[in-house]
């Protein structure tokens, strides 16, 4: 038995951001608070969204003080603006950060309290106001997921909230909005999407339907992410990476992520490492650790990413590990040892292991990891 969750509508194509006002009128509940990032506002990336809402008479306010790794403070500030301006719809335009804040604002407006009150799975009692999610990266997949990740400043802990009430009403994916991503951001968000594809494929909650989405996403991203990194204006690469991110987002929404994400969240929260980079530095090692739990699925992933089938599933899967390793190097993603010292890591290790286990994601891994094994990895 399984369930399937996704937005009520998914709109994909060049120039589709200009239709935001139309969808806000059809699916929203009044004026919209636009939540975005400072660079996106300064550079004009978000302007087609704003102009469309202006023309529809639905632009209420703009909150653009959102970093890539938002905290509960940003949520409180955005919620205050949402209420002061008496908005009834939220339009999130950006990477995972703005979309995560939009979900948290909708959550707290309807249910009160703090983000920590709802951390975990299925703890949100009531749905909030409609969200229209417009990603500018490829990507977090947050535009189609029922998750939000917010860092609690006081504890330096990433809080994961999972509820189908957080799935946006509409996802609008316009490849033109991704052209402004610098190469480093293309790499980090792209590996995040690839990790979604890989983990959703081998997750204990995966189904035949989600695995199909996972495999298509992995193949698409392995092929086109290096092209988008090297040639930011390549239209086909940008389009295919955004589509791969969408497919991976649909897959993990309905099958969950696993050990990589469980370990990456505390790594990012404690040391300020971008989420995609945290995934990247852990991905290959955890794939190798997890291989005995799902050799056939890892082999299918390897073939989807371009590996030539070898004599056994184990051999084919290991060829896939090589593809991932080369891709991470090609994208110039640093190693963990280049990001922090061993002493700094050891000082936070016990807390990070506890937070990883508490998130629930490691329980979905095809090979279960003990706290000691998580610390070793």
Predicted regions and their residues:
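N-terminal amphipathic/basic leader segments beginning at the initiator methionine
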Residues: 1-27
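Short glycine/serine/threonine-rich phosphate/pyrophosphate-binding segments
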Residues: 17-20, 42-45, 72-74, 97-103, ...
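Glycine-rich phosphate/diphosphate-binding loops that line cofactor/substrate pockets in enzymes
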Residues: 18-33, 51-56, 84, 330
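Conserved beta-strand elements of the Class I
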Residues: 33-34, 89-91, 132
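N-terminal small/polar loop signature for handling phosphorylated ligands or for N-terminal nucleophile
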Residues: 41-116, 226-238
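A glycine/threonine-rich phosphate-anchoring loop and its flanking beta-alpha core
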Residues: 110-206, 297-300, 304
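Active-site segments that bind and position negatively charged phosphate/pyrophosphate groups
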Residues: 200-326
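Mobile late-domain/C-terminal helix-loop "cap" segments
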Residues: 284-377
């Amino acid at each position: 038995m399984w369930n399937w969750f996704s937005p009520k509508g998914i709109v994909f194509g060049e120039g589709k951001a200009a239709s935001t006002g139309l969808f806000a009128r059809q699916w929203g509940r009044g004026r919209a608070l636009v939540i975005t990032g400072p660079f996106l506002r300064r550079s004009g990336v978000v302007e087609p969204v704003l102009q469309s809402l202006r023309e529809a008479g639905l632009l209420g306010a703009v909150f653009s003080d959102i970093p890539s790794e938002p905290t509960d403070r940003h949520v409180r500030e955005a919620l205050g603006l949402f209420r002061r301006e008496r908005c009834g719809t939220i339009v999130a335009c950006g990477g995972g950060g703005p979309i995560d804040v939009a979900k948290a604002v909708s959550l707290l407006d309807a249910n009160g309290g703090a983000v920590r009150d709802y951390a975990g799975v299925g703890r949100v009692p009531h749905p909030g106001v409609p969200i229209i999610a417009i990603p500018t990266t490829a990507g977090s997949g947050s535009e189609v997921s029922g998750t939000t990740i917010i860092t609690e400043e006081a504890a330096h802990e990433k809080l994961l909230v999972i509820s189908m009430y957080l799935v946006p009403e509409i996802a609008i994916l316009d490849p033109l909005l991704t052209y402004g991503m610098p190469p480093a951001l293309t790499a980090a968000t792209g590996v995040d999407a690839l990790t979604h594809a890989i983990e959703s494929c081998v997750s204990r909650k995966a189904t035949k339907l989600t695995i199909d989405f996972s495999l298509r996403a992995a193949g698409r991203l392995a092929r086109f992410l290096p092209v988008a990194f090297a040639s930011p204006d390549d239209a086909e690469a940008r389009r295919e990476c955004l589509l791969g991110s969408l497919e991976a987002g649909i897959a993990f929404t309905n099958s969950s992520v696993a050990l990589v994400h469980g370990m990456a969240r505390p790594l990012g929260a404690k040391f300020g490492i971008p989420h995609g980079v945290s995934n990247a530095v852990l991905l290959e090692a955890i794939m190798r650790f997890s291989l005995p739990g799902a050799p056939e699925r890892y082999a299918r992933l390897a073939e989807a990413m371009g590996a030539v089938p070898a004599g056994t599933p184990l051999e084919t899967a290991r060829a896939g590990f090589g593809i991932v390793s080369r891709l991470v190097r090609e994208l110039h993603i640093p190693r963990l040892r280049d990001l922090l010292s061993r002493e700094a890591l050891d000082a936070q290790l016990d807390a990070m292991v506890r937070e990883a286990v508490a998130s629930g994601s490691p329980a979905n891994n095809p090979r279960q990891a003990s706290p000691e094994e998580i610390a070793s990895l």
